[in-house]
């Protein structure tokens, strides 16, 4: 079972993974007042929203209102957006990619990480994507994550290590099939924030 982005981010917040402040709206009247602008995101169970026009970055409260009016009911790849997630705007310094998933080859969890996240993750070269299998009996340790991250020239390794540790705990405790953060961003203030969420739960 796939979760909507806002549902996945609630899980993230519950487990201490930083996410942008935001509210879910289903009508224009529910739109929050954001003088500094914000991001309006359609809540549909499909990928590629950004490229399909389902995400609007707004510079003012008026633009947020217009985006909510325009995007409510929008159909993205056959899915109608009945809800929108309206969030604060984050100043992005760098985008990363991370996911934890069940590796079908050996039926164990695997951690995937790249220093090149965002909408074009599918086109990232293989040498910029690293994968490590996780022994489900032992779990994941900080040194394993740091060893993985050491293959990239990135800052804030300790923050990212902490987020991945929390993400694995969420993955294990909720018996997830997939947990993806794309992008996981470094802000201009040096914070690491989960800007999106994709979660698939076990139907059983």
What are the language-model segments listed below?
Residues 1-28, 32, 36-37, 82-84, ...:
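Preference for protein termini
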Residues 78-131:
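Hydrophobic alpha-helical hairpins/lids featuring a short glycine-rich hinge
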Residues 67, 72-77:
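Glycine/small-residue-rich loop that forms an oxyanion/phosphate-binding "nest" at active or ligand-binding sites
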């Amino acid at each position: 079972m796939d979760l909507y982005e806002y549902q996945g981010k609630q899980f993230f917040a519950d487990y201490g993974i930083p996410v942008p402040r935001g509210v879910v709206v289903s009508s224009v009247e529910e739109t929050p007042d954001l003088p500094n602008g914000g991001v309006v995101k359609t809540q549909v169970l499909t990928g590629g929203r950004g490229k399909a026009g389902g995400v609007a970055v707004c510079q003012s409260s008026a633009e947020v209102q217009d985006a909510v009016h325009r995007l409510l009911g929008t159909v993205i790849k056959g899915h109608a957006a009945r809800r929108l997630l309206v969030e604060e705007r984050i100043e992005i310094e760098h985008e990363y990619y991370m996911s934890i998933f069940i590796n079908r080859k050996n039926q164990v969890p695997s951690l995937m990480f790249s220093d090149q996240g965002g909408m074009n993750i599918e086109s990232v070269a293989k040498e910029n994507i690293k994968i490590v299998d996780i022994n489900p009996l032992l779990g994941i340790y900080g040194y394993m994550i740091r060893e993985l991250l050491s293959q990239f020239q990135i800052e804030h390794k300790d923050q990212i290590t902490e987020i991945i540790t929390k993400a694995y705990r969420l993955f294990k405790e909720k018996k997830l099939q997939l947990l993806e953060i794309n992008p996981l961003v470094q802000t201009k203030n040096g914070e690491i924030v989960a800007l999106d969420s994709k979660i698939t739960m076990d139907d059983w």
